[in-house]
Amino acid sequence: NYALKFTELGPAVLAGLEGIQVDGAKRSSLSAAQGNIISTQLIAVQKMTWPTFNPNSVRDVKTLFQILGGKDATNTDVKAREKLAEKNPIASRIFGAIDAYKKASKLVGTYLNAPLYGERLLWAFNPFGTDSCRWSSSKSHLFLMDKSKYIHFGAQAQNLPPYAKKMLRSDDGFWLYEIDK
């Protein structure tokens, strides 16, 4: 297996170090659109709950959960929220806004605001990353030291959502296409 996969190591490293061009204007507009969703949903959630409610706070969500009737729940994950939302239409509305807020926050924080290397989104491919011989990906191994923390460039390419792919553009003489889904 190693002998067969070793030939993939060079292309994996090269692809990760080359990355892909990002259209800065498109990235900014996508990020701004998601920023509007974040602020709109936060205002809506805070109107439906209390003014200092933080959708990312486990404590706040757990308190809300108990207020809405989820007293015996052990956690507040998506499945638990869906279960409570089926019983309580008010909970359904509030959790819908919380989920929209979290989805937009994840999109902005993980993909749209990922640190770029110049104008390029980098990643690291691992040809040995799965048992099924498929490649896995992660943030690039290139980083900057900022005070006491490392800032890695890019994002993992494997789960890049279609919305975030709109900011990518091919280099001159190349095309972008996707063979999965």
What annotation goes with each model-predicted range?
Residues N1-A164, R169-W175, K181:
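Conserved "right-hand" nucleotidyltransferase catalytic core of DNA-directed polymerases
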